Amino acid sequence: AHERMSGGSLGQQKSLLRQLKQMAAEDERCGGQPLDKDPTFARRIAEIEMELRTLEAFNMRAIDKFSRDGELGGKALGAEANIFKIRSTEIQQRLTELKVEAINYYAMPYQIAALKHGWNEPAVGAEYANGCMPSYLHFRKVSIYSGSNEIQHGIIAKAQLGM
């Protein structure tokens, strides 16, 4: 249960959301306007932010339950850990997808030298674009480790529905 509750770092997801908002505010693909002025993209950012806040509240309730009734009280987290793992990995993946979409083709170049101290060449695209695609690809695996999301769904079904 512990690895599933920590598998999707809320702090990391909040950081990804801040980066996404910065990208959307600076990118001017929407008819010369920042991307966050595009109603469709702004709605998608708002949706993921609401999901992240809901997940944070869910996590706090689970931690509270565990701290009151946890292993010392003879109970462990039940489906909460599985649900948190599923939702947090889905949110992580959607955040990185939106980041790649926000910077468009600038997501592709990976300038490893630009990350080194002393780099003074112009970067391809915005500074925050560097490493965006590797991050996106890295977060494809989060739905697999700590038990794939499909396995987590099965565990929830067995535990909660008696299947």
List where the protein language model places each region.
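C-terminal helix-coil-helix/basic helical segment that borders enzyme active sites and/or dimer interfaces
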Residues: 32, 53-122
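Generic, well-ordered alpha-helical scaffold segments in large soluble proteins
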Residues: 19-27, 48, 58-61, 65, ...
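Short beta-alpha connecting loops at secondary-structure transitions
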Residues: 1-6, 41, 69-84, 137-143
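Glycine-rich, flexible loop segments associated with nucleotide phosphate handling
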Residues: 18, 34-43, 74-81, 121-133
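Glycine-rich beta->alpha junctions and the first turn(s) of the following alpha-helix
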Residues: 1-55, 142, 158
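Glycine-rich phosphate/cofactor-binding loops in nucleotide/flavin-utilizing enzymes
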Residues: 1-10, 106-163
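A generic structural signal for well-ordered alpha-helical surface patches
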Residues: 43, 79, 86, 93, ...
